[in-house]
Amino acid sequence: MGKIIGIDLGTTNSCVAIMEGNTPKVIENAEGARTTPSIIAYMEDGEILVGAPAKRQAVTNPKNTLYAVKRLIGRKFEEKEVQKDIGLMPYSIVKADNGDAWVEVRGQKLAPPQISAETLRKMKKTAEDYLGEEVTEAVITVPAYFNDSQRQATKDAGRIAGLDVKRIINEPTAAALAFGLDKNEKGDRKIAVYDLGGGTFDISIIEIADVDGEKQFEVLSTNGDTFLGGEDFDQRIIDYIIGEFKKEQGVDLSKDVLALQRLKEAAEKAKIELSSTQQTEINLPYITADASGPKHLNLKITRAKLEALVEDLIARTIDPCRTAIKDAGVKVSDIHDVILVGGMTRMPKVQEKVKEFFGKEARKDVNPDEAVAVGAAIQGQVLGGDRTDVLLLDVTPLSLGIETLGGVMTKMIGKNTTIPTKFSQTFSTADDNQPAVTIKVYQGEREMASGNKMLGEFNLEGIPPAPRGTPQIEVSFDIDANGILHVGAKDKATGKENKITIKASSGLSEAEIERMVKDAEANAEEDKKLRELVDSRNQGEALVHSTKKALGEYGDKLEAGEKDKIEAAIKELEETLKGTDKAAIDAKTEALATASQKLGEKVYADMQAKGEAGGAEQAAGAQAGAQAGQGAPHDDNVVDAEFKEVNDKK
């Protein structure tokens, strides 16, 4: 069985880790970085860029470069958070047929899980390149405060990426795992994990206990805000720059998509710089132009100014901390360690606020970017059966219930209940001779059902006629270890029952997921063909280069007919290389290799006569070229690099 990898699918950045023995290893991607921007770009020729390459071209392709898509996952188009994002994002957020928030790119409507799957596929490939084998199983993390629809949508994204998602685990819990297994302190410890990432905020109170040599991680409570994070901090800076520029130059940059993309990049850079310096300068030449000519943007921002701009955002994280402490039934003074996770916790003001609330400095020995992926990898090792000294007890973040008479939310499972869990309760009919009941399932803390998030509904039909209040209908709730809900209803008199896994009343249908999986596979096939074409092209170009070089030096030793033949073959291959027909390129490469065989022999004979190293190099070039065309085995792992010969002899 292959390794189960751990993936932190973040709003802004993602990260993948594996376990090597009992040591976690965060894997570097193809660009050599340990985290990958969660940015996906759809190019005109159908190519999809993920990570740093997508981020690099965002300024020139803002409408088709998608970032922070995690903020839309599992959400309805009408939700106020989505409506807020519509005005801010350079790309187009649209309403899907099922009422979900989707994205439109180059005339094609895409579901957020489908877009996130591209990031997951890159993480999967990163792990495969490192391990040298196929990876099919993963543990993926989500914000602790994600509701059922958001968890389900994340699982769907994994499937579309070709992964069997063994478990969805909460980010703060994963960070606690990474922290707890690294430490040798004995006895029980209560820790607070404060996780402020790119798009979401979570706070979890977790107890780490030693039980007969086994480390038990029990989540006591969790709280948060799934629409608060670094993206909001960036937006405050962008709004400030736009306001200042309008005052100075009288031009409103908020309507200019290209300018906005440059501002986003500059805002993020300024925010990061202000964590280590007191002042930074934003310098964007040619940001826009009007009748009087081009306009340049030059603005100084101090750390104090940034802190004033985002003060209320930081303050918004404190209320959930208060609630989590209360729900956990502990006092602030009971907390042994405070762990900071997520890039935003590098901001000094955030650290200061956390210290103020918890009355102690946060630990500095946890990597805020990597701890979550490491925790996911540890959980993967536990699920794979390779580790038995860890037990994880997580909770459901929000109460679950059904709508009963008068639109009341009757709670079946309270928030912060340890999962997996089951609960059932008996209900009855509201009218005489009622033949069916509709079970509407909600998640949230409000007293009235309409104030909560509706997860789904289903009918139990065929109830025998009876006065109201007589039939006995048992409704059962079952939450699995992923935090995903399964609901059943059963008429006790007839034994009739109906069960559903709560697929959000929207969400992706099985058929849609299957289609997206097939699309993804087709894309992979397309990518493979493209790669093979590039390889053939490189081979052809290398042969043209080496043959021309040898021809320049040894051509006069050939018969005129031979030389013409080679030159004609070079010309034909050069023409074919301009096209995209791989078979034709291969055929012409082979033809040139055959035509230049005599030339290779001349080079070789000359080299033998002279016995010179330089000649050997030349011959190797022509010979290698000739062999390449003659179907010599081609090593996929060899990448042609461009190089220049340096002549050191003065």
Curated annotation (Swiss-Prot):
Residues 609-632 have a biased composition (Low complexity). InterPro entries: ATPase_NBD, Chaperone_DnaK, Heat_shock_70_CS, HSP70_C_sf, HSP70_peptide-bd_sf, Hsp_70_fam. It comes from the Bacteria. The modification Phosphothreonine is found at residue 200. Pfam families: HSP70. Transmembrane segments: none annotated. The keyword Phosphoprotein applies. Induction: By stress conditions e.g. heat shock. Disulfide bonds: none annotated. GO terms for molecular function: ATP binding; ATP-dependent protein folding chaperone; unfolded protein binding. The keyword Iron does not apply. Residues 609-638 are annotated as: Disordered. Keywords: ATP-binding, Chaperone, Nucleotide-binding, Phosphoprotein, Stress response. Acts as a chaperone. This is Chaperone protein DnaK. It comes from Ralstonia pickettii (strain 12J).
